[in-house]
């Protein structure tokens, strides 16, 4: 008997992955790897996972054993990367998305399906995920052929695809058609069936949404009319009901708001404003039904394209595309944001993914 071992506390550093555009001048050569200090937010660089072109968005598998990347290019693709217990990474292979310019992907909570959004071609795709995390042949491709595109849009532009917190529906946000589509996913066939659609203001350019943890409200950033929209979601029917556009606190004109995130307790929402180079803070009230604008905070970088909270919502990471940096903030219990250290250099940083 070797004596009782004290239970291991949470590890002081956890992995952090970085998306980039490999095709841009000054861009990275693949998916960046790093580690972050779970207390201070300090980031330490690691090697690059090469062999993935334009990995502009990254999504984890619920098991923690795999991560997925889009290749945002003409012949769109999605790639699976295995994460070894020792922290090493191995590319498992890629599959075509059936469209062009995929900008977003997410894993269905069952862990069995990968959902991706082809921005340029305006379609959404489904791929099966095997036991080892690798991807099978695409099982569906749905093009947002109606309604007609909004003002100034040449066609549909699917920008995001996510599963509702209850797991019952898949929602796709289309910037070109100013529409959020609700689908049911056939969990055995991997096919999508549209059940409803929600119209946003013409020309608003809906881009990304984030659900409140209560599962009945979502917050949608519209990048062309510079608004945040509180949307009600009905888990029974999948109906998605947008409210009026609300201020981002960034003044007149558009600041191309990019992505909202919601703290784990559902108390605060943060929004990245690319043109304004700021983070808007909102307090969540009314059980998720109301956003109260608090203020805007400088992001400390240029063109914040994507935000991510650490798993415990104690840290906020911002990927700043034009300054090629990641800035980190400590998140207070009162929703305050406090800069944590110097910006971390990351070439053409367009996505940051802190892993649990």
Question: What are these model-predicted stretches?
Answer:
Residues 88-160:
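Asp-box/WD-like beta-propeller blade repeats and closely related beta-sheet repeat scaffolds
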Residues 21-23, 72-74, 119, 129, ...:
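Short loop/turn segments immediately following the C-termini of beta-strands
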Residues 27, 52-63, 98-112, 146-166, ...:
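Beta-rich, blade/repeat-based domains predominating
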Residues 44-111:
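Blade-loop segments of beta-propeller domains
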Residues 34-41, 80-87, 126-136, 183-191, ...:
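Short loop/turn segments immediately following beta-strands, especially the blade-tip
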Residues 44-50, 90-96, 139-140, 146-152, ...:
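A short beta-strand motif characteristic of beta-propeller blades
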Residues 322-327, 334, 338-356:
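Blade-level signature of beta-propeller repeat domains, shared across WD40, Kelch, NHL, RCC1
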């Amino acid at each position: 008997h070797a004596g009782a071992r004290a239970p291991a506390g949470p590890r002081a550093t956890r992995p952090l992955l970085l998306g980039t555009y490999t095709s841009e001048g000054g861009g990275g050569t693949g998916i960046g790897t790093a580690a972050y200090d779970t207390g201070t937010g300090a980031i330490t660089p690691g090697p690059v996972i090469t062999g993935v072109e334009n990995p502009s968005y990254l999504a984890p598998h619920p098991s923690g054993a795999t991560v997925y990347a889009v290749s945002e290019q003409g012949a769109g693709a999605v790639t699976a990367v295995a994460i070894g217990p020792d922290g090493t990474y191995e590319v498992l292979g890629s599959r075509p998305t059936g469209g062009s310019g995929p900008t977003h992907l997410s894993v269905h909570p069952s862990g069995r399906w990968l959902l991706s959004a082809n921005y340029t071609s305006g379609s959404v795709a489904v791929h099966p995920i095997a036991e080892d995390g690798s991807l099978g042949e695409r099982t569906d491709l749905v093009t947002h052929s109606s309604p007609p595109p909004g003002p100034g849009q040449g066609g549909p532009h699917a920008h995001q695809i996510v599963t509702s917190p209850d797991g019952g529906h898949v929602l796709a946000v289309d910037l070109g058609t100013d529409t959020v589509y609700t689908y049911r996913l056939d969990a055995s066939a991997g096919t999508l069936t549209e059940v409803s659609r929600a119209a946003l203001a013409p020309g608003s350019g809906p881009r990304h949404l984030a659900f409140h943890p209560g599962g009945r409200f979502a917050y949608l950033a519209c990048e062309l009319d510079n608004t945040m929209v509180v949307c009600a979601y009905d888990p029974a029917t999948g109906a998605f009901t947008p409210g009026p556009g609300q201020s981002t606190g960034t003044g007149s004109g558009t600041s191309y708001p990019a992505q909202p995130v919601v703290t784990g307790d559902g108390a605060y929402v943060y929004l990245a404003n690319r043109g304004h180079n700021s983070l808007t803070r909102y307090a969540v009230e009314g059980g998720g039904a109301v956003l109260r604008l608090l203020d805007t905070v400088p992001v400390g970088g240029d063109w914040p394209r994507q935000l991510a909270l650490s798993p415990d919502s104690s840290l906020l990471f911002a990927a700043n595309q034009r300054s090629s940096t990641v800035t980190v903030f400590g998140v207070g219990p009162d929703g305050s944001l406090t800069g944590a250290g110097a910006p971390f250099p990351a070439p053409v940083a367009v996505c940051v993914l802190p892993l649990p």
